[in-house]
């Protein structure tokens, strides 16, 4: 069973331990908290309809000493530029300096596909040789035509870049077990 360990705004407050950890990141309102709750089968993370709620790095741990990290979302326009810059610096510091981090799960909203900011984040991850796995969220919100469009976008992007991905739904639990298997392979 997972439990909340702590929230942190900078390096001095990180949760220090010797175990492996994985992190979840994506646009604001992409469904990070809902996905964490689907993966852990409990209301671990606070889910909000308001984007930009998570503004700290949140650490969770289970009895197997597996650590999940919930990173603040990016791209929320209503936050001040100063706060957005501070949050991005905090996340960058975490991603570039966290030796415990084994895999970053980058969440992409299936309804939007790859946005400009998602592509910028992917470039940052590649430039810094960070391990990442793409998770397309909210597939349950798409009709058949939209699912076909998403698959075309993924195929087009795969022609340019190679990446591993899964399409999931926190709501219906579609492919959540496959994602759990992937996550467990990183511990």
Swiss-Prot record:
Positions of Mg(2+) binding: 33, 54
Q: Which UniProt keywords apply?
A: Cell cycle, Cell division, GTP-binding, Magnesium, Metal-binding, Nucleotide-binding, Septation
> Does the UniProt entry include the keyword Secreted?
no
- Molecular function per GO: GTP binding; metal ion binding
Q: Which SUPFAM superfamilies match?
A: P-loop containing nucleoside triphosphate hydrolases
Its biological purpose is as follows: Necessary for normal cell division and for the maintenance of normal septation.
Give the family, as the similarity comment puts it. Belongs to the TRAFAC class TrmE-Era-EngA-EngB-Septin-like GTPase superfamily. EngB GTPase family.
Q: What is this protein called?
A: Probable GTP-binding protein EngB
- Origin organism of this chain? Mycoplasmopsis synoviae (strain 53)
Task: Tell me the classification of the organism that encodes this protein.
Answer: Bacteria, Bacillati, Mycoplasmatota, Mycoplasmoidales, Metamycoplasmataceae
């Amino acid at each position: 069973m997972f439990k909340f360990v702590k929230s942190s705004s900078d390096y001095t407050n990180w949760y220090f331990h010797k175990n492996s950890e994985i992190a979840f990141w994506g646009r604001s309102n992409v469904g990070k908290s809902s996905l964490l709750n689907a993966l852990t089968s409990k209301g671990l993370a606070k889910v909000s309809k308001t984007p930009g709620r998570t503004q700290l790095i949140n650490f969770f741990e289970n009895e197997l000493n597996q650590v999940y990290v919930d990173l603040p979302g990016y791209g929320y326009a209503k936050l001040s530029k100063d706060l957005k810059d501070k949050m991005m610096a905090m996340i960058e510091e975490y991603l570039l300096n966290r030796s415990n981090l084994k895999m970053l799960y980058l969440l992409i909203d299936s309804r939007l596909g790859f946005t400009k900011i998602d592509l910028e984040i992917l470039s940052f991850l590649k430039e810094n040789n960070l391990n990442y796995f793409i998770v397309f969220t909210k597939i349950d919100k798409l009709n058949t035509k939209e699912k076909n469009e998403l698959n075309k976008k993924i195929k087009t992007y795969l022609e340019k870049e190679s990446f591993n991905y899964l399409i999931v739904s926190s709501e219906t639990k579609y492919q959540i077990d496959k994602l759990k298997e992937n996550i467990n392979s990183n511990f």
